[in-house]
């Protein structure tokens, strides 16, 4: 439309028009001129905003080779229901060195990389729609993985899980177990998931894998404050650790709780241009081009068919298998045969003092309220007072999901934005630097609304850090079934 609304004229009946033109009197007087019809009235039809029609498709080019394409012609088509002529704008994210002239994108990738192309179509009334695609110059794909003749044991049935992880009502871990009934971890399914998790084919550039941001030696977290994905743009948040992720309640995936399952999280990571950047159809095609994936899918799902749904299910099974239960804390405090161990007799005096501080639920401000043991995870989200004012609202009002404390000594940097480089900085925050705000979690406020702080002596700070280090699971992190097979 060329205006915000269109007026539909009202057509008057002929009899009414005749009555309006009838003579006003007798004699020789001339009849009056007909009265003009009333102004056209009718229903107001609102402007129809442009819409995107079609699915995203991406463009592959060669490293070192010049290319040029019309972004509007290549992108998913933007249509206007009113037939308005649209004005287009093309914006690039990533891949410095490429150029935009009008709607034409051109340039040369000097190394493997990718760029996100956003096309916005705007009608004369200012309504718009945006479509996007990715131009990628991929690296050569990796070779075949080295796999054992017999799959590793991943399913719960083959693991020596402590009682707390199997049937404890006190710690409620089974009640928090988010394995979907139709996709419980199997040995063959997680074996396929392990290959997918470490395969750089999962990125549009063949340069990144899930394991690039979730590194085994760092507790399946990242040592970087903000990782960069396929298009080379830093992500907005620190990558969270995946260990014991299956014990997060439904709805608690990502720091802002925005997705409902591991599969949803994997789909987002695979397809967002700022992460791995693929489309699921393109990913299916890449895996079909290999010789080794079909047998793995056959073993996992009963047929060699490679589908996006199966890719997501296998990744979910592998992440579900990332269970930490062999730390020094577990050896000291697990319940075995229904009998709880004496933690104090198995931890050092300093570590036991730290455990007491951590678990003392008689205090209003206890670590265990947000970081349950033994899983180290929690379902809650909270504003933990790192800022009095915030720009990242998280799940709302500056609230974020607490991280698992499993392997916490290895998962630095800390917080959703990676602002703290060491455990001591985290302890100091809760000790004396919790910031007051109207959104501060109630567990961190006293009855007057003031921030509650630990105010620990130095010896207790050291003890708390020593206890947190007992949650490192070296056995899990060195287990070959979680290693990179490529």
Q: What function would you assign to each model-found segment?
A:
Residues 52, 83-106:
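Low-complexity "stalk/linker" and mucin-like segments enriched in Ser/Thr/Pro/Ala/Gly
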Residues 31-79, 117, 126-140:
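Extracellular interdomain linkers/hinges and stalk-like, low-complexity segments
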Residues 63, 111-112, 204:
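Surface-exposed loops/turns
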Residues 1-12:
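Bacterial N-terminal signal peptides that target proteins for export
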Residues 104-114:
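Extracellular/luminal low-complexity segments enriched in Ser/Thr/Pro
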Residues 19-22:
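C-terminal motif of bacterial Sec signal peptides marking the signal peptidase cleavage site
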Residues 3, 24-25, 32-45, 138-486:
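Periplasmic c-type cytochrome electron-transfer domains
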